[in-house]
Every structure is written in C-alpha cells, then in structure tokens.
A protein has these predicted regions:
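Boundary/entry segment of secreted carbohydrate-active catalytic domains
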Residues: 20-55
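Hydrophobic faces of well-ordered beta-strands that scaffold small-molecule active sites
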Residues: 24-28, 64-66, 105-109, 158-162, ...
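Active-site beta-loop-alpha junctions enriched in small/polar residues
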Residues: 29-31, 69-71, 110-114, 162-167, ...
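Acidic-and-aromatic substrate-binding clefts and catalytic sites of carbohydrate-active enzymes
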Residues: 34-47, 71-89, 167-170, 222-231, ...
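Aromatic-rich peripheral "rim/lid" segments of glycoside hydrolase catalytic domains that contact
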Residues: 41, 179, 264, 268-275, ...
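Glycoside hydrolase catalytic-domain groove-lining segments
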Residues: 49-53, 57, 195, 206, ...
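Substrate-binding cleft and catalytic face of glycoside hydrolase catalytic domains
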Residues: 54-216, 222
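C-terminal outer-membrane/trafficking sorting elements
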Residues: 378-437
Length: 437
C-alpha cells in the first residue's frame, strides 16, 4: 500500500509543467580563486569537502550564477580587492565546471569593467566615445561573441541577465565624466533616456536569442522597496515590447527592508505581470560582524549569528514558497571563506565577507545552507543529476513499484526516474549519480 501511495504522489509531480521547475543555488563567482588559494571547506559536521560543486549538489542545490565583466583589468585596485576579476576566460572555465557538474548556469552580464549597480553603470573603457547606433552595435556584437565562446567552451548559460541591477539604466558613460552619464528613470524620466535604454536592452537580448535560443532572459532590478518605481520599470519594458522572460530582484533585508515588503512586492508583480516568473537573483544575511553602513538593522529579529542567518533563510524560503510566480533563489557570494588563507600575503579579497555560507574562521558550512534546498521541494521534471549518491540509503523503487536497490547504490542504477522510500523523486542521469527531490 505504501509504495502505491508513493507512486501516486510521484505521478502528480511528473505531470507538473516544465515551468514549475525551480532554481536554487548561489553566486559563486570567486570559487576558482578560493580553490587556487587553498581555502579549506568543511561540511557542517567538520568533515573536509574535497570538491565543492558536488557537495552543493548533495545539499539540494541545482543552479549557480556567475558575473562577467568586459575588461576587469581596467578596474581600480580597490575594486579588484572587492572581487572584480571575472573576465571571459575565467567565466568560461568556471562555467564549464558548473555545467559539467549538472547545474543550471545563470550568466550575469555587467556590461562594465567593474561593478554595475544602481549607483554606477560605467561604460567599458574600450567602448568610451560610442553612442547611438554605434553603441548598440558594439553591445550586440559583444554579447553575441561572449555567448558563442561560452557555447563552444561547453558553458552555455540556461539563464542570462542582460545587465546587473539596471533599475536606473546602463552604460551611462565613462566613470570620470559625470556630465556624460545618461540615466534612465522609470518615474519622471525623459522619452530620450527611455528609448536609449530599451534599445540597448533590445540589442543585447537579440544576441541572446540568436546564440542561446533556449536560454531565458532575466531583467534584474533592486527597487522592491519602492513598489511604484518597480512596477513603472516593468510597465515601461512591456510598453516597448521588450522580449524577456523573468523579473529578477535583489533582496538584502539590511538594504531593502523587511520580508513583509518583499512579500507585498511579489504579490503586486504576480497581479500586474502574470506572464512573468520572478527570481531572487541576489540575497544574503550576515552571520558575523554586520557592517556599520546598513540601512536597516534587523539584528533584534535575526541575530548576527549562524542561528540568526538560518532563521532569516528559513523565513525567506517559507515566504517565497507561498508565491507560485517565484521560481529562483540565489544566495550571493556563498563561497566566501577565509579559512586556510594567509590573509596578509595570500588573500582573495581585501575584506572578509561575513554573509556567505561558510564560517570564515572554521571553514564549516553555515546552518543556513541547509535551508536553501527546501525552496526546491516542488520542482518539476527538469531536475538535474548533480551529486554522487543519495543520502539516507533507503530502498529505491522503479515507477512500477519494483525495488531495485538503495540510495547508497544510486550510482549503479541505469538512467531513469525512480522513487525513494520516503516518496521523493530520484533522477538518474547518464554518467552521473542521482539527486532526490
């Protein structure tokens, strides 16, 4: 009787549309550097982690995000010390590893030589002096060439951000020529700045559709605390017929306010843009040493500790799971880890980041890491085989109810869909282990 119930439950999962697939993971744009500097990673029990990507797969994660700069060698020393270094060769190599490990890849175009965010969207040094059609053409060519090289390298992205936190536009002009900055404003802007911005986005998206037609396009903003601006932005995108798939948001409680504000914003987006999915493409919370420049202090709600960080992650996942339009969750800089580094002579960044998912002193995985996988429990058929074996070691059955082995021997099963004794779907890919959902 039990296996019949399990099979019946699984059948409902198998019939879910592909759009029900959820992506959960993090931005790991400095992973290769931490590995090269011999950072020491441990699981929550203190056991060494030999390879971090398979470990993430065993934790239930299925997607990773990488940022890309045009020419990060042009960044300032301070920016390089913050982690600006991801040129195309770097991203191709790490992207290939991510794809080979079975994860989906979110590629984050910054369209700048350094950080791009609401306060700065500096035009790459090599593009300075370009405007109008010439700038649109350069953006199109660059995007197309990058994606061609990513595909050739075995690192084709599944999701593409055409710009990072572009609430106020992109490609404003050279960093030191403030008079040339051309900002787009969804509220109170000019027709000229709107046309300039949306034509740039259209050029980038055109290249994405041509080279990676199956990839989904994300428009990334961070104004969720200002619902009128948030809706005005995406209203403008729809009014110009911009071809995109997903609304991407940043959400850091110490910058953007309480979870209730995000909850309300997600409800508004679902009502107003019912045809669009929403992803939280950046989030995080400190487990130690909250910086002094935060806008909102929630330490009384979520203490600055491992337990406080996990409480935030749990509440975030619970809230997001109530929104059917939310299909992605990415923790920013989750790989940050100073354990094992000689910080005075052999460091990756110039400052510790204490909102990642590893303890900088012990190298152990933070409790919040275990919270993320719960976001993916309703995933549909698009699961990935990203690990080597399934925890628990319980019985495994075919869809017909025939016992064929145990979770510990999942790697020896032929490719296919199976059921674990606790009712989870087990997807076995060719040449991989399995991941239970």
């Amino acid at each position: 009787m039990r296996i019949k119930i399990i099979i019946a439950a699984l059948a409902s999962v198998l019939l879910m549309p592909a759009s029900a697939h959820k992506y959960v993971g993090g931005d790991i744009s400095l992973l290769a550097d931490y590995e090269a500097h011999s950072a020491q990673y441990y699981d929550a029990s203190g056991q060494p982690i030999a390879r971090l990507l398979p470990f993430f797969g065993r934790q239930g994660l299925n997607a990773m995000r990488l940022r890309l700069f045009v020419d990060p060698s042009k960044a300032t020393d301070a920016e390089k010390g913050e982690g600006v270094k991801q040129d195309l060769d770097y991203v191709k190599a790490l992207g290939r590893r991510i794809k080979d490990a079975g994860f989906s890849l979110l590629l984050d175009f910054h369209y700048s030589d350094t950080w791009a965010d609401p306060a700065k969207q500096f035009t790459p040094d090599a593009w300075r002096g370009l405007s109008g059609d010439a700038l649109n053409e350069r953006l199109y060519d660059y995007t197309r060439n990058v994606l061609e090289e990513m595909v050739a390298a075995g690192a084709a992205p599944d999701l593409i951000q055409t710009g990072n936190e572009i609430s106020y536009g992109m490609l404003w002009g050279p960093r030191y020529d403030e008079g040339s900055w051309q900002r787009y404003y969804a509220v109170g802007g000019t027709e000229a700045t709107e046309k300039r911005f949306t034509s740039l986005l259209a050029s980038a998206i055109k290249a994405c559709r041509e080279i990676c037609p199956k990839a989904r396009i994300v428009l990334h903003t961070e104004r969720m605390a200002q619902p009128s601006y948030l809706t005005a932005f995406y209203d403008d995108m729809d009014a110009t017929g911009l071809d995109y798939d997903i609304i991407g948001l940043s959400y850091y409680p110490y910058h953007h306010g309480p979870l209730q504000s995000l909850d309300a914003a997600l409800t508004t987006l679902a009502e107003r843009f019912a045809d669009k999915e929403v992803m939280i493409v950046e989030t995080g919370y400190y487990h130690a040493w909250q910086p002094s420049d935060v806008y909102f202090d929630y330490s009384s709600v979520y203490p600055i500790s491992g337990a406080g960080q996990k409480a935030f992650a749990d509440d975030l996942v619970d809230m997001l799971s109530r929104h059917g339009n939310v299909t992605g969750l990415f923790w920013w800089f989750m790989e940050a880890n100073e354990c094992g580094l000689d910080w005075s002579t052999n460091r990756v960044t110039d400052n510790w980041y204490n909102a990642g998912l590893f303890d900088n002193q012990t190298g152990r995985a933070m409790p919040a890491l275990s919270s993320l996988a719960r976001f993916n429990v309703t995933a549909g058929m698009a699961g990935h085989a990203v690990g080597g074996g399934v925890g628990g070691g319980g019985p495994v059955y075919t869809l017909g109810g025939v016992r064929v082995g145990s979770g510990n021997g999942a790697g020896q099963l032929p490719p296919g869909i199976y059921v674990t004794s606790d009712g989870r779907k087990l997807s076995i890919g060719r040449g991989h282990g399995g991941v239970a959902e």
